[in-house]
Amino acid sequence: MAVSVLEQGNGPQAVLIAGPTASGKSALAMALAERLTGTVLNADSMQVYGDLRVLTARPTVAEAARVPHGLYGHVDADTDYSVGRWLADATAALAAAREQGLLPIFVGGTGLYFRALTQGLAEIPPVPETVRREVRGTAEGLDSLALHARLADMDPQSAARLQPNDRQRVLRALEVITATGRSLSDWQKDAPRPVLDASRCVRLVLEVDRAVLRQRIDARFEAMMAEGALEEVRALAARRLDPSRTVLKAHGAPALTRHLAGEMTLDDAIAEGQSDTRRYAKRQETFFRHQMADWPRATPEAALDALLGMIRPHAR
């Protein structure tokens, strides 16, 4: 029988569940939502898009029917969707959950979303499309180390806190310094009061043994292929979107697109998609280790009990 934590009194503002891809976050969030009358809210930057349900591992129709879900698949692929837009949507979803008496359970692997929720997000002026194209056009001829060196010349403050292989964030910092003449780090210091008070939230990072996670990633990619991932990518490619659109960078999508164009075999595309996903998981773990060091950790097997144990003191 489900129990409403919010009806019992001073429950947590929200539950925040982070972890690398394929770590079992979604299943954990659904189990918790069933136990505590919650709603599962997406905190993954690829699962916001409606076009790649299978390839981005969004909840299935059956899973979504088990408990309320929000912030999944609500964005068209031909859309620029920023952290700021997600935060605005998340704020509205929080208000709706509270009105309905549901415990908000944010789950995902995008660390920047969790940071925006609990630390605030600076109101950085939008980057003009001309600047974006200029920066990304220049970047096409540079490897990650050279691109990072370019950022270090223009914005050493941001370069010092970004890894060279975090190419998207390096590009973002270059766009901001080029468009505004001000470091992204300086803009971020002006962040307003956050939507959530971290001390009043129950937070958890899932930790999975590296070898086990590798096996789970590879097996899940194979399962995605069996469930129609290639057909999803074929339909997306038929839309002929601007190559800079974020959804086209979903893990596995570039390799499968090249396969459809006759540039590589299906086996090679699958292997590349698996390898790309494993590299992404490592980057996620690095972010969690450095940027979310004060969050409690738990294995997938112990996570539900750990969360329930942390929630009880809030509900007294």
Swiss-Prot record:
It catalyses: adenosine(37) in tRNA + dimethylallyl diphosphate = N(6)-dimethylallyladenosine(37) in tRNA + diphosphate. It comes from Xanthobacter autotrophicus (strain ATCC BAA-1158 / Py2). Residues 44-47, 168-172 are annotated as: Interaction with substrate tRNA. Keywords: ATP-binding, Magnesium, Nucleotide-binding, Transferase, tRNA processing. The record marks 110, 132 as: Interaction with substrate tRNA. Coiled coil: none annotated. The keyword Transferase applies. This is tRNA dimethylallyltransferase. The gene is miaA. GO terms for biological process: tRNA modification. It holds the Pfam family IPPT. Monomer. InterPro entries: Dimethylallyltransferase, IPT, P-loop_NTPase. GO terms for molecular function: ATP binding; tRNA dimethylallyltransferase activity.
